[in-house]
Amino acid sequence: MKGRGGILPFLYKMTEKIILFTRVPKEGTTKTRLYNFIQPKQAVEIQIKLLKKNYGLLASLNKELLVFHDGNREDNDFMNSIIPADKFFYQRGENLGDKMYNAIKDVIEDGDKVILLGSDIANLSQNIIDMAFKNLNTVDIVINPSEDGGYFLIGMKKPIKEVFDLPSYGDNTVLENLITVIKNKNLSYYIGEVGLDIDTREDLLQAETGYRDIELLGAGEYNINFTFSDDESIKKVLRINVKSQMDLENQIEYEYETLQLLKNSSVTPKPYDLVTNTTLLPYKYLTMEFLNGRALDYRADMDIAAYLLSKVHNTKFEENNLICASNPFALMYEECENMSDKYLSWDKEDKKVSEYIRKFLSKCKELIPNEYKIASPCIINTELNSGNFLIGKSKEDSFVIDWEKALIGECEQDLAHFLAPTTTFWKTDIILTKEEIEDFLKKYSQYRDYDKERFERYLIFNCLRGVTWCSMAYREYSESTKLLMDEFTFNKISSYVSYEFLENISKYFE
């Protein structure tokens, strides 16, 4: 290369510039694909953490760093409260491709090497940046793919408009389309390390845990379960607690301790890890054994259920932090009274339904003992229904799951909840006959003794609990104060406050 004064030095050092592309973290526009998993405010907090971390890394590399955000001048003070940039630039263009091209075109000069990257990469490292600039010495374009089929970094020595004119930027064909354009233009390119761009809840979980192959297993109002593969490709469960039914601040720790206490039962999931300090994830979580099986069939699997419950109830336990209710009937009644108040105070109550509820409450109030001593204390689930069982090919290959509300109590409470009509009817249309209940208890008694009188008292209270909960939920769903997940749920709740159902279970309160 020749200049006015003759030949330039053999090594010509290009100026290395970094363009950091980011959104202004705002609720409603930031990480919106995470809103089915976390609150908008939490999504903003995650974006801010990633922006701070990645800006700090890039600022330490002694390159020219230019921050382009999607806001305007009014957003600069807020952005400055997050990162100490001397100046901000504004993204402009009709789409993401236009915005990236315009940014590179505006800052690149002869002799520059420019890379542009997003701000929310979980695994950004100095090596990624170093390799990008190094390879720009020998190729036209460098690319770092993201795991979702797109890319998070692109670098070049001159702006090339066609590279950014892709059909779309919102699907898994982005990288493929980009490479096609590059090849058609006869450009040389280098593909670097893959980055994790956090867009979905699976991305967030992978960034937090390092686990791979994360897939949703099941979600409820209080917990969300995912499967993942560990380093040895063994399938496990990641369980996240989002809210506590027991109003506990340490809900996931409580369930983890329960699983530890029950691990020798051989019929519950083995717990692995408990994580309470997280970097990005706003929830605590535990990992546990993945178990195969189907839901319990009340007509075919009662022998297995008797065996499983006895294994749980017969498990010896050491000193622990599980809640032990000294007078469970008083606590159950208080809970039921509070739930029933929601319906009984409703201006749209059905007078006849309210009459049934008051009758049931009155009967249970009479049955509350002044003093009560738990006999033969054991670990109980307290919420057993057909969905709490995973039935395999045999009783030894079957399990009891979901231990978020375990207590130290009496086996009769578990048995009564499991057999109560308000339980069996919830996920099925089955109400066990008196003979079927007695047959199950006979099978259970082959493994463990139970007290018939205590069982019958618990049975009545569990019927009350089911009815009062449904009456409360019926009002909440009717007023749209509770998110309705599906029509089946509302129809089932409605059936629990129907005259026919209430009359059918009123025999338990005679």
Regions from the PLM with identified roles:
Residues 468-510:
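ATP/Mg2+ or Mg2+-diphosphate-binding catalytic cores
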Residues 413-449, 462-480:
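Active-site activation/catalytic loop segments of kinase-like enzymes and analogous catalytic loops
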Residues 26-27, 31, 243, 277, ...:
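A glycine-centered beta->alpha junction motif in the catalytic cores
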Residues 209-211, 317-382, 386, 392:
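An alpha-helical support segment within catalytic cores of ATP-dependent transferases
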Residues 221-334, 374:
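ATP-binding pocket architecture of kinase catalytic cores
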Residues 14-34:
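N-terminal nucleotide-binding beta1-loop-alpha1 segment
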Residues 124-148:
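Conserved donor-nucleotide/metal-binding helix-loop-beta segment in metal-dependent transferases, i.e.
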Residues 217-229, 237-238, 365-413:
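Active-site acidic catalytic loop and adjacent metal/ATP-binding pocket
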